[in-house]
Amino acid sequence: MSPAESSNSPAPGPVVSLRHGTYEDAQALFSGTLFVAMALMLFNQAGLLIGSTAGMAFLLHYVTDISFGKLFFVVNLPFYWFAWTRMGREFTLKTFVSVALLSLLTELFPHVMQGSYINPLFASLLGGLLLGTGCLFLARHRSSLGGATIVSLYMQNRYGVRAGKV
């Protein structure tokens, strides 16, 4: 294919999501948020940071000593309006549940799992794997953890721009 032909190729169309049952959605939302909560615990133990609303909540947590879970929930509140108006009721409610569950799990984890030291390289590799897998679970079941993910999924659905590229 010549460069002229490839530049005229159409942009990818919007991604069509599959419908899942209530049980499948509940299982995916729980598993996805559990994976992400474990990743955040690893990052926290190793003193690492993350981007988006989770990163903002981490920074505020380090500065104020208010728990990450509470801050994460509050930081995501402004994004629900965008989700409600652009992504619909189902997506917004699932996202709200996912954010609330992640906030709860991050509050619970320090009471059930503790470690004295974790290698930052190991924490970043395993945490990244858990984080990516958890977010994929959520995205495939029309949910997110708020923040920039809502915007990237909107752009994927509306304009065909892959969420991973945004």
Could you describe each region identified by the protein language model?
Residues 2-166:
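Core subunits and conserved enzymes of cellular information-processing
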